């Protein structure tokens, strides 16, 4: 099954603790970057940065940054970029 559009789903569960799933769909194969930012715009974690086939993809975030440290309670932004398209959504970590 190949989706008909580029889309980013709301993470589930939301709010989450300690993990959440982020899913997105692509109609064609493309370079993809899925990154989590804090509300100050600082990069927290890169979940994916690769060339992926068209279809639906799901990633799990464990609430940790690039150094493996647990991040604090709060709202985070996850951003999906593919080609010239970017979609962002908010999620909340509650401890």
Model-found features: residue ranges?
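C-terminal tail/sorting-segment detector
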Residues: 69-95
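Generic structural signal for well-ordered beta-strand positions
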Residues: 44-45, 71
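Signal that preferentially marks extracellular ectodomain short beta-strand elements
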Residues: 59-71
């Amino acid at each position: 099954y190949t989706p008909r559009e580029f889309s980013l789903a709301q993470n589930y569960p939301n709010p989450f603790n300690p993990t959440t799933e982020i899913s997105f769909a692509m109609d064609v194969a493309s370079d993809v970057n899925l990154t989590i930012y804090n509300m100050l715009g600082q990069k927290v974690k890169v979940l994916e940065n690769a060339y992926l086939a068209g279809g639906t993809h799901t990633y799990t975030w464990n609430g940790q940054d690039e150094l493996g440290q647990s991040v604090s309670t709060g709202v985070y932004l996850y951003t999906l970029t593919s080609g010239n398209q970017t979609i962002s959504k908010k999620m909340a970590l509650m401890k």
